[in-house]
Each structure stands twice: as C-alpha cells, then as structure tokens.
C-alpha cells in the first residue's frame, strides 16, 4: 500500500518556526517583506503563477510579514526586461524589502541571467543568483543555505519520511533552472545516481521504469500542450518506486489544475507518492518562508553568507 508523502506537517512546523523569528525581528524594528515580480503574460503561465503567488503571499502574511506584488506582465514586451531591471535595482536598495521573488518561468524574450545577476544575493529568496548557485554547487547545507525552494522542499520531505537517496537510481524529468537542474546537482551531492531527462531525451519511459525514485518536474500536461506534452503514468514506473510530482498548470478557461503525475495509476505501484494537492506545493511554500526569514536576517545584519547566522 502506498505511503503518501504529504507536506502539511512540514508546512505547519516551518510557519510556526518562522513566527517565532518574526517576533524576534520585531525587537529590531524589522518586518519580513517579500516583493514578487510577475513577468509572464502567457495565459496558462499567468493563471498558474497567480495561484502560486496568492498562496505564497498568504503564508508570508500569516507569519506577520508583508507582501508586495508587481504586475510587470502589463508592460509591453519590448520594455518589460528594462522595467524589471530598474525595479530590481530599486528593491535591492529598499530598506524595507527583505526578500525578492522573480516568479518563474519567465517569457522567452527576457534574459533570465541578466535579472538574477542584478538581484542582490542577500534578498534572493529562490536561491537563483550566481552567488547562491555557486554555494549550492560547492556543497549545500539543507538547513542553513538559501536554496531553490522546490528542490529543498523535496529533500526536506525525504528526510521527514526517511526516504533514502544515497546509492539509489534517481530519474529527474525536467532540467529547468528552478527545479530539475538544481535538484539533480543536490541529489548527486547526496550520492544518488542521477539521470536527468528533458524534451530531447529519447524514450523517457525507458529510464523512469528502471528508477528507484522518479521526480517529475515538467509542467506540460496533455490537456494544455500539444507540443511535447508529458504525464507520468503507472505503466511508466517499476513496482515499489518512490514518485514525486512537481509540475502542474492551470487552465485559464476552466480554472482547473492539471498535473505531471497520474495519481491513481501511479499509486497502485509506488511505495511512496506525493499527492498532487498537499504534497510538494506545501513543501515549496514552507521553504520560501524559511528563505525569507534567512534573507531578512541577512539584510538586518548585512552578512554575506547565511552560514554566518545562528538561527
């Protein structure tokens, strides 16, 4: 019988931890404040990102923090990147802003690298600036570093549910800079044997059927994408595999969610499985709150490394 890897306990414990730190920060006259940049005007991406951001904002406000959302997708495409760069510079210098989230994925005509190079690493709540990426590659600390939220959330769930990755064959479907790529690096550092699949990988099911752990982070459900769609089904895994579903998109017409993993068929064969609702999403949100607390202390103390903090 499948064990469901749920994120509710991790989420609740993290928010409780964060509230204690917000009270401590109040003694110094500091309130965590998250600035969110929305840049993608693709209908599916925009509807999905709005859902995600509303939940993230709810969490931050629930711990006593503040959130400001900048709807840069309303800018004309030819001016959007320049507007984002100007805003990032302003947020870097804003004393009341302690964390900045550039919501991904970005539209293809925006240079992602330029945005994250401009962003201050001490306000980078997604761990995607060059400085934070270097720290991840050099050897990450799950408890102390500013890490990409979804990969870190997944590893925290594995720790909570005692899912061992050392020495196991892990397939990560998707190589995006937000989830697949950093997660593959982190798993290799934990001595897993990692295969990372992407849009040009041939016969992806060949690899997923052999894996001890399958992590699906694509976000191209067949209901919404005719070009290179993806869904992991029960016939694409081996008996007893651990399966983690990350990708999900909202149909802007029906407001319905569609996910990477066919939950019902996969549950018949998997030993551990994250539910599409209440699994990785909650863990991701928990990590964002944790990262915001870390960046708030970094802004307060002006330290350049989170490992210099005692939290």
UniProtKB/Swiss-Prot annotation:
GO terms for molecular function: methenyltetrahydrofolate cyclohydrolase activity; methylenetetrahydrofolate dehydrogenase (NADP+) activity. Pathway: One-carbon metabolism; tetrahydrofolate interconversion. Coiled coil: none annotated. It catalyses: (6R)-5,10-methylene-5,6,7,8-tetrahydrofolate + NADP(+) = (6R)-5,10-methenyltetrahydrofolate + NADPH; (6R)-5,10-methenyltetrahydrofolate + H2O = (6R)-10-formyltetrahydrofolate + H(+). NADP(+) binds at residues 174-176. The keyword NADP applies. Its EC number is 1.5.1.5, 3.5.4.9. GO terms for biological process: L-histidine biosynthetic process; methionine biosynthetic process; purine nucleotide biosynthetic process; tetrahydrofolate interconversion. GO terms for cellular component: cytosol. Pfam families: THF_DHG_CYH (PF00763), THF_DHG_CYH_C (PF02882). Keywords: Amino-acid biosynthesis, Histidine biosynthesis, Hydrolase, Methionine biosynthesis, Multifunctional enzyme, NADP, One-carbon metabolism, Oxidoreductase, Purine biosynthesis. InterPro entries: Aminoacid_DH-like_N_sf, NAD(P)-bd_dom_sf, THF_DH/CycHdrlase, THF_DH/CycHdrlase_cat_dom, THF_DH/CycHdrlase_NAD-bd_dom. It comes from the Archaea. HAMAP family: THF_DHG_CYH. Catalyzes the oxidation of 5,10-methylenetetrahydrofolate to 5,10-methenyltetrahydrofolate and then the hydrolysis of 5,10-methenyltetrahydrofolate to 10-formyltetrahydrofolate. Belongs to the tetrahydrofolate dehydrogenase/cyclohydrolase family. Homodimer. This is Bifunctional protein FolD. It comes from Pyrobaculum neutrophilum (strain DSM 2338 / JCM 9278 / NBRC 100436 / V24Sta) (Thermoproteus neutrophilus). The lineage of its organism: Archaea, Thermoproteota, Thermoprotei, Thermoproteales, Thermoproteaceae. The gene is folD.
């Amino acid at each position: 019988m499948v064990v469901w890897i749920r994120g509710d306990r991790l989420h609740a414990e993290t928010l409780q931890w964060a509230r204690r730190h917000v009270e401590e920060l109040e003694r110094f006259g500091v309130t965590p404040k998250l600035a969110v940049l929305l840049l993608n005007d693709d209908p599916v991406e925009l509807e999905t990102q709005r859902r995600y951001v509303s939940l993230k904002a709810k969490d931050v406000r629930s711990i006593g923090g503040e959130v400001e959302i900048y709807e840069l997708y309303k800018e004309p495409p030819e001016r959007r990147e320049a507007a984002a760069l100007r805003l990032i510079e302003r947020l870097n210098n804003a004393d009341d802003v302690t964390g900045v989230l550039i919501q991904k994925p970005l539209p293809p005509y925006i240079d992602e690298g330029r945005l994250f190079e401009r962003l201050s690493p001490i306000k980078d709540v997604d761990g995607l600036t060059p400085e934070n990426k270097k720290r991840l590659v050099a050897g990450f600390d799950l408890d102390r570093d500013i890490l990409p939220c979804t990969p870190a959330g997944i590893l925290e769930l594995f720790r909570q549910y005692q899912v061992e990755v050392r020495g196991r064959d892990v397939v990560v479907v998707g190589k995006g800079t937000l989830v697949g790529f950093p997660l593959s690096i982190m798993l290799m550092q934990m001595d897993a044997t990692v295969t990372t699949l992407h849009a040009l990988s041939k016969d992806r099911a060949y690899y997923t059927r052999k894996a001890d752990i399958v992590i699906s982070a694509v976000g191209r459900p067949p209901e919404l994408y005719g070009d290179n769609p993806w869904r992991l089904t029960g016939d694409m895994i081996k008996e007893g595999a651990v399966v983690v579903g990350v990708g999900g998109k909202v149909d802007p017409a029906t407001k319905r969610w569609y996910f990477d993993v066919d939950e019902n068929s996969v549950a018949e064969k998997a030993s551990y499985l994250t539910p599409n609702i209440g699994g990785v999403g909650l863990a991701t949100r928990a990590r964002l709150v944790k990262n915001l607390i870390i960046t708030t202390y970094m802004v307060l103390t002006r330290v350049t490394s989170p490992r210099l903090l005692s939290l």
